[in-house]
Amino acid sequence: MSNQDSGNPAAKPPKGKTAARRKARSLAVQALYSWQIAGQPLHEIEAQFRTDNDFSEVDGAYFHEILHGVPRQKSELDSTFEPCLDRPLAEIDPVELAILRLSTYELRNRIDVPYKVVINEGIELAKTFGATDGHKFVNGVLDKLAPRLRAAELRGGKR
């Protein structure tokens, strides 16, 4: 669990924070894709993204956390969602793989973010960046994964 978890998990972030996190996720998935494809060092990718993009409305700390947290936990993240896949990990589209890793990271480490938000954000990222119908694949995987990682939240009917 991240040390940035909210003291009140039921509290909703302010609207501006929600938009800033959405932008952070969007940039993070692009940066993770670059990392997966080019293997460039994370600090170089982060510097490039911060230089090339307007971060005034981006949750920069969240972008940093995702960009560095996902690669650090890559093996654990992959083994967490791999049982939910309908094909071998090596056959997953690189964009969808970046989205699944990001979403799995949030489900595992950011319990302050409701599971429904994580799933919805993953779907929206796949609609924006993924292949045709990639959002359906991402939705299917995350729908199978959420009960395994957020069982108490689902049972409680929260969020």
Curated annotation (Swiss-Prot):
Q: Name one GO cellular component term.
A: cytosol
Keywords (alphabetical) are: RNA-binding, Transcription, Transcription antitermination, Transcription regulation
List, in alphabetical order, the GO biological process terms annotated in this UniProt record. Answer: DNA-templated transcription termination; transcription antitermination
Q: Which residues form a coiled coil?
A: none
Listed CDD domains? Terminator_NusB
Molecular functions per Gene Ontology: RNA binding
Q: Where is this region: Disordered?
A: 1-21
The record's similarity note reads: Belongs to the NusB family.
List, alphabetically, the HAMAP family matched.
Answer: NusB
Question: What biological function has been recorded for the protein in this entry?
Answer: Involved in transcription antitermination. Required for transcription of ribosomal RNA (rRNA) genes. Binds specifically to the boxA antiterminator sequence of the ribosomal RNA (rrn) operons.
Q: What is this protein called?
A: Transcription antitermination protein NusB
Name its species.
Pseudomonas aeruginosa (strain ATCC 15692 / DSM 22644 / CIP 104116 / JCM 14847 / LMG 12228 / 1C / PRS 101 / PAO1)
* Gene field: nusB
